[in-house]
Amino acid sequence: MREGIHPDYYQAKVVCNCGNEFVTGSTKEEIHVEICSKCHPFYTGQQKASSTRGRIDKFNKKYGVSNN
């Protein structure tokens, strides 16, 4: 392999907006993220019912689609 062409690899500190921090490998020394597994609704079990159901009903009503 040629020397000097590969980026440096660091033990990067990942910082979330919720305050959670963890370490991973990356070519950057520090990474800032908006959502992590500690605060994401899927992982915390605090998912809210989505409005998708209402949108589907609105579409079906608009175009006369029945659920048969």
From Swiss-Prot:
SUPFAM superfamilies: L28p-like. Binds 1 zinc ion per subunit. One of its GO terms (biological process) is translation. Zn(2+) binds at C16, C18, C36, C39. One of its GO terms (cellular component) is ribonucleoprotein complex. InterPro entries: Ribosomal_bL28/bL31-like_sf, Ribosomal_bL31, Ribosomal_bL31_A, Ribosomal_bL31_sf. Binds the 23S rRNA. NCBIfam families: L31, PRK00019.1, PRK00528.1. This is Large ribosomal subunit protein bL31. The lineage of its organism: Bacteria, Bacillati, Bacillota, Clostridia, Lachnospirales.
